[in-house]
Amino acid sequence: MQSLLEKNGVVAYTNTKVDRVGNDYVKITKVDEQKKMKIPSAMTMLIPPFRGQTLWSRVPHLTDKNGMVKVNDFQQSHEYSNIFAVGVCVSIPPIDKETLVPLGAPKTGYVIESQGTAALKNIRTLINHEEKQMDTQPELRNRPLLNGLCITDFGNDGAVFLTLPQYPPRKTDITLHGKVAVTAKVAFEKYFLHKIRAGNTDPSYENLMLHLIGIDRVTSKKEDASA
């Protein structure tokens, strides 16, 4: 990412924390060099780390120290079997714990779709189990594979990212750069809006196409055993 920014004329400061933001400047500290700097800035935009809702933190043992919901492999709360969480609110440990400035794990759209699909299937299992009035605890089988698939544009350029899974260790890690990614991004946006308008947000042909190139959303225990 740093080399890509510099290639486009953007100066990047890594291992840096923000000390102060003024009307026309930003004061930072390079943690690795213990060097303080004052950078002129006509417009400053900060993207702070996500934190969970205060309401969640009030529930005993539901969240981590940042208020994110702790879940098991099936998107289910460790402490409350009737609570499932997907998306940005889920607690995911940092990928690299050795960084000087704490970093979080990326949560991309396809990963969140995978979490949602797994949660939906597992909730359905719980509902069916209750309707049958069975005394035993239901066995959840569906867990998200957390594969990463992303199309992004950088103005006149773009890239397609494919990581299987998104978080290391990975089996596949592919990045394709080029102007064609910009066209692909526009085409995908039109396709996505068409799905929403048509009310068919999870078409079978899309899942089949992705499956044929090795990208799936969820796996079950039966599939794990046969793999």
What are these regions (language model features)?
Residues I39-S114:
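FAD-site-proximal beta/loop scaffold in flavoenzymes
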Residues K36, Q75, R141-N142:
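Short secondary-structure boundary/capping segments
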Residues A118-A227:
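C-terminal, flexible cofactor-proximal segment of oxidoreductases
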Residues S3, K7, R51, S114-L126:
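Flavin-binding catalytic cores
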Residues G22, K65, E79, L145-G148:
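A generic structural signal for well-ordered coil/turn residues at beta-strand boundaries
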Residues G22-Y25, N82, G158:
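Structural motif
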Residues M1-V71, E131:
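A Rossmann-like FAD-binding core segment of flavoenzymes
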